[in-house]
C-alpha cells in the first residue's frame, strides 16, 4: 500500500505548473476577485507545499499528526456532549439540552463559510490557529458557567473553534492528497474513534460529572492545544522546506510586485468576499426560527407569549430578506446559485442535509433515553452512544482502500442511505424497556456503517466536482449544510420533546411535583427511583411515547434522503488533487450517462439483448 500511496502523488510535481497555469487563467478572468487579496498566491503556496509531501516519511507524519489532533478533538467532543447534559441538569433545565445543541449548530452555519473563504485568503494554518483560540475561549467560559445563558454563550465560542478546527483539518488533508486517496487521508483524524468508545465510558464514570462537570470541561483548554501542536509544527516545517525552493522564492517576488490596495480597500473587499450581510441574516434568521421551537412548551403556555411569536415571525421575514439579498446584491453569495444549479452539487448537499438531520433527530436525546428508559449505566450508555463512531472508524481503512481501487462513490452513498432506513426502523422498535438493549446496539452498528458510507463520501464527491480554487468554498458549503441539518434536526427533536414529554409525565405519574423533577432533572430522578418502581415505570412509558414520535419523523425523512442520492453524479477519483480539465466556471463537466436511471435502463437493455442471443 505504501508504494501506492507514494505513487498517488508522484504526479504532483509535474502537475504544479499545469495547476498554476489554470489558477493563473482564473486569476486574470476574475481580476475583481484577486486584485486586492493573496488568494491566488495562497493556492499556489499550497501547490508547492503539496510537492514536499511526496516522501512516504512525510505522508506518515501527516497522517500521524492528524490522528493525534483528531484524538484530542474527538475525545473532547464525545465527553463534552455528555457533560453538557449534566451541566443543564445542574441548572434544573435538562429539557433545554436541545436548545444548546441548536445554538451550536446555528453558529456553525455562518462560521463554516467564513473559515473556508478566509483560509484561501490568509492560509489554512493561520485560520487553524484562530479556530484554536476560539476553542480555548469557549471551553473556559463553559467551564465557569453558573447558568444556562452563560453556558450557551461559551458554546458559541467553543463551537466556532470546534467547527473551524475540523474544517481546516479536512482542508489541510485535502490539499496534500489526491482524490484517489482523499478518503484515506480524511479518515485519519477519525481513527481515534476506534479507541474512544471504550475509554469514554470509563472516563465519564471516573470523572463523576454529576459533581465535577465544570473541571471536566476546563481541562480541555490545555489538553486540546497540546494535541494540535504536532500538526502545527509539521506544517511550519514543510513551509520552511518549501521556502527553500526556487518556485517559492519566485512566487513571493511576484506577490510583492502585485500587492495593491491599502487597509481600507482590503477590508471592503473582505466585506463583500465573505458576504458579511448574508452571514448575519442567515444566522439570525435560523436562530429566531429554531431556538424558540425548543423553548416553547405547553406547560408554560409560551406559545401564547408574544415574544415567542414575534421572534418566529422576525426569523421568517429575515430568511426571505436573506434570499433577496443573495439573489440581488451579494457579490460573492454564500450559496453561489450558478454552482448549485448542477445536480452534481445540489444532490450531494441534499444528501448531507438529510444525513445530519436524521442523525440529530434520532440521537439528540439518546443518552438520557438509555439511562432513564433502558436501565443502562453511564458507562454502557456512553459506549452505545459512541458505538456508531467506533464502527465507522474501524471499517474506514478497509473502505478507503476499496474506494482507491474502484474510484467511485455513488453506490456507496446509496447503500448508506438504505442502511439509515434499517437503523431508524430498529430505533423505532427498540425505544425503551428492559428488552431494548440488543436492538439499540444493532441499530447503533448499522448507523455507524451508514455514516461510513455517506458522510465523508459526499465531501470527496463534491471536491471531485470542483477545481482546487473552489475546493475550500464547496467544502465549507458542505459543512454548512451539515450544520444546517444538525440545527433543524436538533430543533425538531427538541420541539417534540418539550411539547410532548411534560404532558406525558403528568399523565402517567399523576403527581405534578414529581413530573416536574423527572422533566427538569432526569438524572437526579433515576437516582431516587430505581428500575422497577412504579414511578420509574411511568417515566419509561412516557419516554417510549415521545421516542415513537421522534423516530417516526426520522424514518419519514429517509425518503427524501434516498431521493437525493439517486440524482448525484459519480465523478472518477483520479491521481490528482482535483479535476482541472473539462471544467467550466470552476465545475467539472460530466456527461449525464452516469445518471443512475440511465444505468438502470442500460442494465435492462443488456439483459434483453442477452435473452435474444440465448445467453
From Swiss-Prot:
Segments on the Extracellular side according to the record's topology features: 80-120, 174-186, 238-275, 328-343, 405-407, 462-547
GO molecular function, one term: antiporter activity
Primary location group: membrane
Induction: By iron depletion and by heat.
A Gene Ontology BP annotation from the UniProt entry: glutathione transmembrane transport
Keywords from the named record: Antiport, Cell membrane, Ion transport, Membrane, Transmembrane, Transmembrane helix, Transport, Vacuole
InterPro entries the UniProt entry points to: MFS (IPR011701), MFS_trans_sf (IPR036259)
Subcellular location: Cell membrane; Vacuole membrane
Regions of this protein lying in the Cytoplasmic compartment: 1-58, 142-152, 208-216, 297-306, 365-383, 429-440, 569-615
TM regions (residue ranges): 59-79, 121-141, 153-173, 187-207, 217-237, 276-296, 307-327, 344-364, 384-404, 408-428, 441-461, 548-568
Keyword Manganese: no
Membrane-topology descriptor: Multi-pass membrane protein
Record's keyword annotation contains Transmembrane helix: yes
GO CC annotations on file: cell periphery; endosome; plasma membrane; vacuolar membrane
Family recorded in the similarity comment: Belongs to the major facilitator superfamily.
Protein task: Proton/glutathione antiporter that imports glutathione from the vacuole and exports it through the plasma membrane. Involved in resistance to oxidative stress and modulation of the PKA pathway.
Listed name of the protein: Glutathione exchanger 1
Gene: GEX1
Amino acid at each position: 500500500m505504501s508504494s501506492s500511496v507514494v505513487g498517488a502523488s508522484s504526479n504532483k510535481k509535474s502537475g504544479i505548473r499545469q495547476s498554476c497555469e489554470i489558477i493563473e487563467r482564473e486569476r486574470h478572468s476574475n481580476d475583481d476577485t484577486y486584485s486586492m487579496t493573496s488568494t491566488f498566491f495562497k493556492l499556489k503556496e499550497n501547490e508547492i507545499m503539496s510537492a514536499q509531501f511526496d516522501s512516504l516519511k512525510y505522508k506518515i507524519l501527516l497522517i500521524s499528526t492528524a490522528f493525534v489532533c483528531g484524538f484530542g478533538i474527538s475525545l473532547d467532543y464525545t465527553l463534552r456532549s455528555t457533560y453538557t447534559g449534566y451541566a443543564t441538569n445542574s441548572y434544573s433545565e435538562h429539557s433545554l439540552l436541545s436548545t444548546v445543541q441548536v445554538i451550536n449548530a446555528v453558529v456553525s452555519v455562518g462560521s463554516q463559510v467564513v473559515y473556508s473563504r478566509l483560509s484561501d485568503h490568509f492560509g489554512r494554518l493561520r485560520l487553524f490557529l484562530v479556530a484554536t483560540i476560539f476553542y480555548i475561549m469557549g471551553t473556559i467560559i463553559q467551564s465557569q458557567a453558573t447558568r444556562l445563558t452563560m453556558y450557551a454563550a461559551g458554546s458559541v465560542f467553543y463551537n466556532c473553534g470546534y467547527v473551524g478546527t475540523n474544517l481546516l483539518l479536512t482542508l489541510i488533508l485535502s490539499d496534500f492528497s489526491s482524490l484517489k486517496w482523499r478518503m484515506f487521508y480524511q479518515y485519519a483524524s477519525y481513527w481515534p474513534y476506534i479507541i474512544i468508545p471504550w475509554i469514554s465510558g470509563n472516563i465519564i464514570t471516573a470523572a463523576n460529572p454529576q459533581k465535577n462537570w465544570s473541571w471536566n470541561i476546563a481541562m480541555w483548554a490545555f489538553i486540546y492545544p497540546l494535541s494540535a501542536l504536532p500538526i502545527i509544527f509539521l506544517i511550519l516545517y514543510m513551509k520552511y522546506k518549501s521556502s527553500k525552493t526556487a518556485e517559492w522564492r519566485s512566487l513571493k517576488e511576484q506577490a510583492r510586485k502585485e500587492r495593491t490596495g491599502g487597509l481600507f480597500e482590503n477590508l471592503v473587499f473582505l466585506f463583500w468576499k465573505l458576504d458579511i450581510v448574508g452571514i448575519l441574516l442567515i444566522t439570525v434568521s435560523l436562530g429566531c426560527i429554531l431556538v424558540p421551537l425548543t423553548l416553547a412548551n405547553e406547560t408554560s403556555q409560551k406559545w401564547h407569549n408574544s415574544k415567542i411569536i414575534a421572534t418566529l415571525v422576525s426569523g421568517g421575514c429575515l430568511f426571505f430578506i436573506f434570499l433577496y439579498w443573495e439573489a440581488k446584491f451579494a457579490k460573492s453569495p454564500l450559496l453561489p446559485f450558478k454552482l448549485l444549479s448542477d445536480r452534481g452539487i445540489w444532490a450531494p448537499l441534499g444528501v448531507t442535509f438529510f444525513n445530519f438531520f436524521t442523525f440529530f433527530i434520532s440521537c439528540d436525546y439518546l443518552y438520557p433515553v438509555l439511562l432513564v428508559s433502558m436501565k443502562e449505566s453511564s458507562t454502557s450508555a456512553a459506549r452505545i452512544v459512541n458505538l456508531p463512531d467506533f464502527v465507522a472508524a474501524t471499517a474506514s481503512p478497509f473502505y478507503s482502500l476499496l474506494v482507491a481501487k474502484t474510484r467511485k462513490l455513488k453506490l456507496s452513498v446509496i447503500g448508506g442511505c438504505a442502511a439509515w432506513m434499517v437503523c431508524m426502523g430498529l430505533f423505532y422498535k427498540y425505544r425503551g424497556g428492559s428488552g431494548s438493549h440488543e436492538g439499540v446496539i444493532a441499530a447503533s452498528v448499522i448507523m455507524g456503517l451508514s455514516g461510513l458510507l455517506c458522510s465523508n463520501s459526499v465531501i470527496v464527491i463534491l471536491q471531485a466536482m470542483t477545481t482546487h480554487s473552489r475546493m475550500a468554498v464547496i467544502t465549507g458549503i458542505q459543512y454548512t449544510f451539515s450544520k444546517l441539518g444538525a440545527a433543524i434536526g436538533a430543533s425538531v427533536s427538541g420541539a417534540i420533546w418539550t411539547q410532548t414529554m411534560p404532558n406525558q409525565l403528568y399523565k402517567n405519574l399523576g403527581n405534578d411535583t414529581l413530573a416536574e423533577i423527572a422533566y427538569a432533572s432526569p438524572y437526579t430522578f433515576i437516582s431516587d427511583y430505581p428500575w422497577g418502581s412504579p414511578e420509574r415505570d411511568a417515566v419509561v412509558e412516557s419516554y417510549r411515547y415521545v421516542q415513537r414520535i421522534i423516530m417516526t419523523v426520522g424514518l419519514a425523512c429517509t425518503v427524501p434522503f434516498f431521493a437525493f442520492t439517486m440524482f448525484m453524479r459519480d465523478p472518477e477519483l483520479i491521481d490528482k488533487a482535483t479535476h482541472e480539465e473539462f471544467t467550466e466556471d470552476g465545475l467539472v463537466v460530466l456527461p449525464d450517462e452516469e445518471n443512475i436511471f440511465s444505468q438502470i435502463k442500460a442494465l435492462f437493455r443488456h439483459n434483453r439483448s442477452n435473452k435474444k442471443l440465448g445467453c
